[in-house]
Amino acid sequence: MVKGKYEGFSASGAKDLVFSAWVEVGNWNEVLRRLMDLKFALQADRDKIPGVLSDLNMESPFTRFKRFSDGEEYALLIKEANIAIAQIQAASAFKRRADEKNAVSGLLTQSAQQPTSSIQGSSQATVVRPPRESDSAFAEDNFSFGKFDDASTAFHKARSYLRGLRLVALDQEDFEEKFKLVWKETPQQQQNVTGPTVPATSSGGGKGPGVA
């Protein structure tokens, strides 16, 4: 990498954007494509979200002493985009407690004594009944579904926002023109590694050069 620095960097607006989130266009499109393929209702897909987001590189492509990347396009992420990414990350942490316990949502089984009659005798049977609101399992399931709806809504809204986001891509030329920056390379010092010249003498003890 050629050493140098941007002249006038402190007075430019670029100085305030060094610590902002930037994305390389190709990397952004790939991560967004993978997010669009995920089905939030599936726990296996929710578990993939952190890994997908971790592949998104949001480092700045420039500093005062690092020239804007050449041959690539980058875009600055606005505040709302960063919030949407954080919402997707938070939603991915959702897990249904009922699912983790291998429970069946909304159904409880119990053994009940069927009434006897003159035609059918007394027998033991398993009856599936709708849960009552007083059932602790039902209350837990309602609470779990409520959180799932919130998490699912947050995920889909945030993902749709990112998909519809129109990023402004900049390459090196665009960036330097926009912020009126000039890159100045650091001069390379040429070191003299040659030693002093020693007069040569002829073999056999003859007179050296310059001797009359």
Curated annotation (Swiss-Prot):
One GO CC term, this protein: viral capsid
Disordered: annotated span: 109-128, 185-212
Compositionally skewed regions (Gly residues) per UniProt: 203-212
Entry's localization field: Virion
UniProt feature, compositional bias: Polar residues: 109-126, 186-202
Location, primary (coarse class): virion
Any one GO molecular-function label of the UniProt entry: structural molecule activity
Superkingdom of origin: Viruses
Protein name: Coat protein
